[in-house]
């Protein structure tokens, strides 16, 4: 029986989970539309979740909330977490840095002073991109030669950033190649070309950036 996901009809916290599942597992998703608040709250405490929230993930008797816990569970099922304490710690390090990368944009995206904060964010962005470029190096993926959940976390963060600054990867060809490599994975390519793929919004509908009903007038590269 396919696992079940539940989340709003946004990319938000769920998108890396969707990408990971599209890469290697069948699932069904309960999408909650913008005006489905009452629908969600009527079901919230009826799903058997220990800490009810969105996103949620139900795989037989395993019922989880919190996007990182969901990602780690799925990744662990597919041997992506590492087999030694050192490998697992390194994966955790990449996870934390990927969360920081996405939350850095999220923090300013919901702030009423977004336009003011954006200037400082963009000023620091090249340093952040260089850090990730140096970390990736000549490897095709962040853990070396095989795809893992952290690749989808970083892909999604970088893709969101490209909507704010379409040229952010111009000086980092290995990151450009990394993004193209993820997009070219057969199952990911098929998903992105399907009507199930959510292109927008990146964040909640009320966000100053990444919300609303349509992306910025400029398109990311």
From Swiss-Prot:
Its EC number is 2.5.1.18. CDD domains: GST_C_Mu (cd03209), GST_N_Mu (cd03075). It catalyses: RX + glutathione = an S-substituted glutathione + a halide anion + H(+). Substrate binds at residue 110. Keywords: Transferase. PROSITE patterns: GST_CTER, GST_NTER. One of its GO terms (biological process) is glutathione metabolic process. Residues 2-82 form the GST N-terminal domain. Residues 84-202 form the GST C-terminal domain. GO terms for molecular function: glutathione transferase activity; identical protein binding. Pfam families: GST_C_3 (PF14497), GST_N (PF02798). Glutathione binds at residues 7-8, 40-44, 53-54, 66-67. Conjugation of reduced glutathione to a wide number of exogenous and endogenous hydrophobic electrophiles. Homodimer. Belongs to the GST superfamily. Mu family. This is Glutathione S-transferase class-mu 26 kDa isozyme 1. It comes from Fasciola hepatica.
């Amino acid at each position: 029986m396919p696992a079940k996901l539940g989340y709003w009809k946004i990319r938000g916290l769920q998108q890396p989970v969707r990408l990971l599942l599209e890469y290697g597992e069948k699932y069904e998703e309960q999408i909650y539309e913008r005006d489905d608040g009452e629908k969600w709250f009527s079901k919230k405490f009826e799903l058997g979740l220990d800490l009810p929230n969105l996103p949620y993930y139900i795989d037989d008797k395993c019922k989880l909330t919190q996007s990182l816990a969901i990602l780690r569970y799925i990744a662990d099922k597919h041997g992506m977490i590492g087999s030694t304490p050192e490998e697992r710690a390194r994966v955790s390090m990449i996870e934390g840095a990927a969360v920081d990368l996405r939350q850095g944009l999220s923090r300013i995206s919901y702030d009423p002073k977004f336009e003011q904060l954006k200037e400082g964010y963009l000023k620091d962005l090249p340093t952040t991109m260089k850090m990730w470029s140096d970390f990736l190096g000549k490897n095709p993926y962040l853990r070396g030669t095989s795809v893992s959940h952290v690749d989808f976390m970083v892909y999604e963060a970088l893709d969101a950033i490209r909507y704010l600054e379409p040229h952010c990867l111009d000086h980092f060809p290995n990151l450009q190649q990394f993004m193209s490599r993820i997009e070219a994975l057969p199952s990911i390519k098929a998903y992105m070309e399907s009507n199930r793929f959510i292109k927008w919004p990146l964040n909640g509908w009320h966000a100053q950036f990444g919300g609303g009903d349509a992306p910025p007038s400029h398109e990311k590269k």
